Amino acid sequence: MDTMQFIACVLQNACRIRGYKLGHDGSDGYSDCIGLIIGALALGGVPWPGINGTNYTARYLVDGLRQNADLKMGDLVFKARSPGEKGYDLPPRYADSADQLDYYHVGVVLQADPVRIVHCTAGGVRLDEKRGDWQYSAWLRLIKNQQTYAATVTAENGSTVNLRQGPGLQYEILRQVPIGSAVEVLGETDADWACVAYQGMEGYMMRRFLAPRLSQEDERYEQIILLRQQLDAIQQAVLAAQKALEELVKTE
């Protein structure tokens, strides 16, 4: 399974999850945080090789676990607590582990810039658009790190993005590529630059101007997740308003 297939399966699994239950993987409509990933892999025919748990995953199933590093599409991200921190609850099986952090929550990076992280929490499936407490990131060994993918050129300002001869601002501009253009990412040079192909020409473009292109089906899945999240927020606001109204009526 490559990166884009993994993302597609994560979104597909997220859309069938209706609620949170510990130890579930989405196949029956319920999931916990790691179950979102386990169920996604199952949809792609990849079996889970160990314990259903975020601490197990962070210790045995990922490469390059790092803190506050640049995110990549397809990364797993973790929230963690240190010994003595409120809520710290590292399972006893890891008492002898060199790493004593409690990795208590996990999500998947759908997009690195701007950030979009999908995860399953007590309130259901959520899409985070800020990094927040997602301090740790790593690559799941079960996924082939896909360097080549289709992307759309994007920027908040201006009408074009520069395609350069090399990976740096000092290199000559080969083309000014219009925002919204489709390009093929051939490889990521470093945290800032990627090699891309545009209309038969190869060059380098800053990664922050490249948004991976999801299939129409994947975009629909993502929209379903967002709409459900918005609906949940509205329902919670209505319940809070009803409670406040009841309290006011009691005081009359």
Model segments located where?
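N-terminal capping segments
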Residues: M1-P49, K72, A80-H105, V118-C120, ...
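Soluble non-cytosolic domains of exported or imported proteins
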Residues: S27-D32, G168-Y171, D232
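Short alpha-helix capping/helix-loop boundary micro-motifs
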Residues: A58-Q67, P167-E172
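Loop/turn positions that initiate beta-strands
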Residues: M73-D75, G180
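A generic structural signal for residues embedded in beta-strands
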Residues: F78-K79, V185
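SH3-family beta-barrel domains
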Residues: K144-N162, R175-I179, G187-T189, A211-E222
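SH3/SH3-like beta-barrel superfamily modules
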Residues: Q176-R208
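Short, low-complexity, charged amphipathic interaction modules
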Residues: R220-E252
